[in-house]
Amino acid sequence: TENIYFALNSSAIRNEEKMKIEKLAEFMKEHTECNITISGYADKQTGNADINMRLSKKRAENVATQLKEMGIDSQRITVDYKGDTVQPFSTREENRVSICIAE
């Protein structure tokens, strides 16, 4: 699992997180049997449920778009988003996209 962290109330991928996506793209090019699920999350303590659902969706879609632009076939990418309805992480880490790699 790889995590891409976002600033509060933002779906923009920070420069320091882009390197993680680049490494993931290289891994996927080397391991063509692997697929990924990208799950977006948002912080329940900010915004409302509607806003947080849209924000988590946009975060996940932005990561997927970056991977596609790096040559990863969209058939290998599943996008999922949870808004603030699922909180498996501590508060500081809720503003993230979690990427699960499967063979």
For each feature predicted by the language model, list its residue ranges.
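Secondary-structure transition/hinge residues
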Residues: K29-T32, G71
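Alpha-helical scaffold elements within enzyme catalytic domains, especially in hydrolases
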Residues: F27-E30, Q66
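Conserved phosphate/oxyanion-binding catalytic-loop motifs
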Residues: I38
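Short, solvent-exposed beta-strand/turn patches at coil↔beta or beta↔helix junctions
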Residues: T1-F27, A42-D50
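Periplasmic OmpA-like peptidoglycan-binding domain that tethers envelope proteins to the cell wall
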Residues: N15-K18, Y41-E103
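Envelope-exposed proteins and targeting segments
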Residues: E2, N9, T32-C34, Q75, ...
